[in-house]
A protein has these predicted regions:
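Canonical Radical SAM [4Fe-4S] cluster-binding loop centered on the CxxxCxxC motif
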Residues: 7-50
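Conserved, mostly hydrophobic/aromatic
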Residues: 28, 36, 51, 70, ...
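Conserved SAM/AdoMet-binding glycine-rich loop
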Residues: 60-161, 165, 241
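Active-site-proximal loop/turn and secondary-structure-junction residues that shape catalytic pockets
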Residues: 74-76, 106-108, 134-136, 172-176, ...
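Structural recognition of alpha->loop->beta junctions
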Residues: 92, 117-126, 185-200, 268-282
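A short acidic, helix-capping loop that chelates divalent metal ions and anchors anionic groups
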Residues: 136-142, 211, 256-258
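Conserved C-terminal portion of the radical SAM core fold
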Residues: 150-211, 226-249
Length: 282
């Protein structure tokens, strides 16, 4: 039987690269973020029978892998009963799997009751990957993120109370030149009030045919240079006071990777950034 996964490009976190990738949905049900190219894609929810058949196919070649990642940019927005059925398939066809992860938007988490989230956890959901992108409400509004920083914290605190692990992403330079300072300050402030397993600092890429591309063309958004993004990130990292958190950026100056565990590697990562800012090799 052929693989039923039809996504042209697989979007999964780097930390899930060794997981079994099972398609549940494609695209984003929100699709309104100014910086995101998913706004141009059709949002699709794959039928449960389709997911079941794909799980059967993947089970034959999954080997001893112990984790599954449910593909789809915010599959947690699906009805809880639908997700529970998918988790049943995971249990049935991947008996060695110990952990299931997926993407989620903060409002998807807030929309589900604690009972619903507890049921998902009890059926195997262990990890959520969530885009904070910025802790500044000004930046979030500019980018039409559809959620406030306080609502984001509400989602993280719900996960904390349920002992569900989560990984966060932030985007360097998302505030442009005008909002750079507040972007760093507020993002660090929000991150310091959460307990993420990891933070992945992403590079801002301005996709064609997006609202952000239009903003740049009008002169309403002035993009930071790679060095300015690095200086911004260095300030963000210096402001973080987190424990047991893996920090990662694979796009430093478009050519370097900086990663390490907080708090132990904080000083060495900052030192590496300082060398790059000074024009030296890391």
């Amino acid at each position: 039987m052929e693989n039923l996964t039809v996504e042209k490009t697989v979007y999964a976190p780097l930390l899930e690269q060794d997981s079994i990738l099972l398609s549940v949905s494609e695209g984003c049900s929100y699709g309104k973020c100014a910086f995101c190219d998913f706004a141009n894609d059709q949002y699709t929810v794959f039928p449960l029978e389709w997911v079941k058949e794909n799980a059967k196919y993947l089970a034959a070649q999954s080997g001893d892998k112990s984790s599954v990642f449910l593909l789809g940019q915010n599959s947690l927005s699906l009805p809880t009963a639908h997700i529970l059925k998918v988790l049943e398939y995971v249990k049935a066809y991947f008996p060695k799997v110990e952990r299931v992860g997926m993407y989620a938007r903060a409002e998807d988490i807030n929309a589900k009751s604690e009972r619903e989230m507890s049921m998902l956890r009890d059926f195997g959901l262990r990890t959520l990957h969530i885009g904070l992108e910025s802790g500044s409400d000004d930046v979030l509004t500019l980018m039409n993120k559809g959620i406030s920083a306080s609502e984001f914290l509400e989602a993280c605190h719900k996960l904390d109370s349920l002992a569900l692990s989560y990984h966060l992403t932030t985007i360097g330079g998302l505030g442009g030149k005008e909002l750079s300072a507040v972007h760093v300050e507020k993002t660090a402030e929000i991150l310091n009030r959460t307990y993420p397993a990891s933070i992945w600092q992403l590079k801002l890429f301005i996709w064609p045919n997006t609202p952000l591309a239009d903003m740049r063309a009008r002169g309403d958004f002035i993009e930071l240079s790679p060095m300015e993004v690095l200086i911004e990130e260095r300030e963000l990292l210096a402001r973080l006071h987190l424990n047991n958190c893996f920090f990662m950026d694979t796009t430093v100056l478009n050519q370097y990777t900086i990663m390490g565990h907080l708090p132990d590697a904080k000083s060495s990562m900052i030192a590496a950034m300082d060398r790059l800012i000074a024009g030296d090799s890391p």
